[in-house]
């Protein structure tokens, strides 16, 4: 559910960072040897000053205040400082700070696609089986648990999830006599028909692989699989190629957005232009929070001009991307994981903070604020309107990127952006798949590409 995504400088730099972490992590990642945390004669943990890093602005102030107040009330004499880190700088900051016991944050939020690299590098303290069960166990979102695990040992837990679905101009679709599609092919036909010189039927940047891989997943394809001890890029798999070719057709037929574009504020495309006339797009694909940037202009309680969150459902509406044969297509799941630094000098206090984060009260607050809770037992809280219902529905059908140790290097080098741009520009998908398989496979296994 990130609003911006990790873009590191190069693959080599990301791999170097992971190697540095590996070198600094011991075989026993449960706690650093020089941990200063002590217990009193009564067995209670001595007070300490804990630092939590949150990524971006998705955790509302209300939730941050709750964490600070509750932690300090339950851990007398201890303090909690919450520091917000920009998504774009997060990997670099984690890599320089996590190995340093003097400067490491104690508990960190990181993206679900970043978690495998850091867990494989030994950056995090193990979540014991007993603590795992206490914090939710198998009710925790399992795809995110897998992203934070190595060989069955859990190091990073789900924090929150978000999903993506289709936002569309219901008035424009209705005027064109087009119904909400029930298959992926019908979707492609519909948005191609809606396209004009001034309006995308479906606004999609050519480099936007995070939306584009939904076509791969819907066709039964994978980005990579683990064969024995090695990860292998599977772009050349026939199902993956089918998905990429279908995405290519949709991009070429429906989008006016340049092939060079990636992180596009698609939500703006649905809104009426200030000067009047048709919007820039009839359809977009975006995370659920995009709703609050879409709609007619109104004033909030402070007198500020804001969007009304799609209040007019005859004008703005949503639907899940349909699958090849109907149902709901698997989409890429956004969201975050939460972990304790292996070098934290306050491991027990850190675990106490986790107990608050995974408490019924905090999970309820996440759901009430539109953030998919880590504990799936609280999903029903979100299902009070169509937005919550579709978030849960699409999340239940979502998929993650491969949990390979080198995945952050692939993302950091913008390899998929490059591949999807070439596909958007009309490149031969089969040839490009073979070429990029050779590039990506060694990177997935922590080797320079």
Task: Label every PLM stretch briefly.
Residues 105-106, 134-171, 201, 322-323, ...:
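A structural signal for short loop-to-beta-strand junctions that line the ligand-binding cleft
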Residues 155-159, 164, 188-242:
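Extracytoplasmic/periplasmic solute-binding protein
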Residues 129-140, 222-242, 249, 299-314, ...:
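Short, solvent-exposed loop/beta-turn-alpha elements that line the ligand-binding surface or hinge
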Residues 111-164, 215-216, 311-319:
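Hinge/lid segment of periplasmic solute-binding proteins
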Residues 267, 289-308, 332, 336-410:
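Mature extracytoplasmic/periplasmic domains
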Residues 174, 396-449:
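Conserved C-terminal helix/tail region of periplasmic/extracytoplasmic solute-binding proteins
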Residues 70-140, 176-182, 273-276, 282-283, ...:
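Extracytoplasmic "Venus flytrap"/periplasmic binding protein-like
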Residues 198, 223-300, 348, 432:
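Extracytoplasmic ligand-binding clamshell segments of periplasmic binding protein
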């Amino acid at each position: 559910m990130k609003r911006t995504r990790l873009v590191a400088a190069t693959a080599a730099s990301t791999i170097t960072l992971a190697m540095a972490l590996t070198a600094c992590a011991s075989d026993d990642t449960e706690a650093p040897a020089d941990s200063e945390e002590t217990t009193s004669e009564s067995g209670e943990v001595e007070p300490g000053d804990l630092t939590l890093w949150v990524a971006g602005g998705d955790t509302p102030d209300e939730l941050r205040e709750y964490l600070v107040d509750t932690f300090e009330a339950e851990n007398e004499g201890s303090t909690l400082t919450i520091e917000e880190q920009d998504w774009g700088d997060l990997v670099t900051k984690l890599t320089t700070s996590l190995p340093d016991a003097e400067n490491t944050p104690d508990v960190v939020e990181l993206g679900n696609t970043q978690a495998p690299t850091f867990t494989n590098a030994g950056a995090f303290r193990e979540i014991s089986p007993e603590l795992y069960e206490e914090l939710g166990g198998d009710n925790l979102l399992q795809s995110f648990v897998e992203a934070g695990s190595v060989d069955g040992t859990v190091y990073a837990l789900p924090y929150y999830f978000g999903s993506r679905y289709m936002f569309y101009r219901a008035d424009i679709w209705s005027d064109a006599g087009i119904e909400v599609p029930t298959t992926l092919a019908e979707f492609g036909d519909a948005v191609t028909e809606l396209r004009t010189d001034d309006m995308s039927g479906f606004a999609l940047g050519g480099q936007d692989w995070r939306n584009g891989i939904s076509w791969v997943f819907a066709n039964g394809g994978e980005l990579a699989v683990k064969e024995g001890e090695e990860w292998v890029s599977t772009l050349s798999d026939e199902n993956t190629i089918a998905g990429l070719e279908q995405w290519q057709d949709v991009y070429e037929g429906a989008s006016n957005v340049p092939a060079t574009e990636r992180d596009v504020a698609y939500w703006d495309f649905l809104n009426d232009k200030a000067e009047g006339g048709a919007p820039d797009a009839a359809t977009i694909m975006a995370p659920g929070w995009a709703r609050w940037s879409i709609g007619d202009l109104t004033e909030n309680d402070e007198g500020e001009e804001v969007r009304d969150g799609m209040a007019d459902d005859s004008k703005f509406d949503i639907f899940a991307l349909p699958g090849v044969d109907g149902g709901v297509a698997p989409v890429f799941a956004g969201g975050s994981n939460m972990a304790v630094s292996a070098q934290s000098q306050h491991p027990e206090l850190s675990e106490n903070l986790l107990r608050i984060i995974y408490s019924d009260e905090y999970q309820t607050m996440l759901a009430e604020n539109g953030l998919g809770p880590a504990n799936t037992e609280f999903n029903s809280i979100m299902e009070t309107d169509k937005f919550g219902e579709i978030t849960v529905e699409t999340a239940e059908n979502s998929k993650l990127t491969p949990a390979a140790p080198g995945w952050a290097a692939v993302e950091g080098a913008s390899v998929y952006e490059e591949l999807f741009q070439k596909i958007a520009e009309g490149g031969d998908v089969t040839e490009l798949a073979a070429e990029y398989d050779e590039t990506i496979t060694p990177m997935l296994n922590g080797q320079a590409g």
